Regions:
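Cation-handling catalytic/transport regions enriched in His/Asp/Glu
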Residues: 1-186
Length: 186
């Protein structure tokens, strides 16, 4: 199992430090790594894990990235070793909730677009994918100011990588991971 990430390079002479977003990405990808590590299959491609479930292990890991007990283990000043202050932990928690409606709308728009691409019956020569995208989103009443997570011209998930007509699994996994996390917290 490997985890490959594309994090920001440090300025010359500076240490490589992760932003809060990059730490979240690392925990997310680590969740995928754990999921793959604990599968009991010889060949990865035939693991039998439904697409609806595949994001759950990675997304549940995102809950722990800013847990105070976890932060105290890894979020330390790189020079002094001082643990992240409680006030900053509280600010991180609040900032993670900011813009959640915007993010959910981005994912929903991308999920609807993905589904509509895969129920197309007639596609004529010279079809304009951006016109199709605008029509799909307009029919659903989505705001132009909140575009899909990925625009059609660079939405790799929808045409490959195992997420064809399954991009909604990110939103569904969020429902499942929040429920599982709350059960853990109880």
């Amino acid at each position: 199992v490997t985890i490959v990430c594309n994090f920001s390079q440090p300025a010359e002479g500076q240490p490589a430090l992760l932003s809060a977003d990059e730490a979240g990405t690392l925990f997310h990808e680590f969740g995928h790594g754990l999921h793959n590590l604990f599968k009991d299959v010889h060949y990865y491609g035939v693991s039998g894990v439904p697409r609806d479930f595949v994001e759950l292990p990675s997304q549940i890991m995102e809950h722990w990235v800013f847990e105070p007990e976890v932060l105290k283990v890894y979020a330390k000043h790189y020079q002094t070793g001082e643990v992240i202050p409680a006030a900053l932990i509280e600010k991180l928690d609040k900032s993670g909730k900011y813009g959640q409606g915007f993010a959910t709308t981005e994912y929903l728009a991308a999920s609807l677009l993905d589904m509509d691409f895969h129920i197309l019956k007639d596609v004529h020569d010279g079809a304009d994918v951006m016109m199709f995208e605008n029509a799909v989103l307009g029919e659903r009443g989505l705001l132009e100011q909140i575009p899909p997570r990925y625009r059609t011209t660079y939405f790799n998930h929808t045409m490959g990588g195992g997420y064809t007509a399954g991009y909604y699994s990110y939103i569904w996994a969020e429902v499942l991971d929040c429920d599982a996390y709350e059960a853990y917290k109880e």
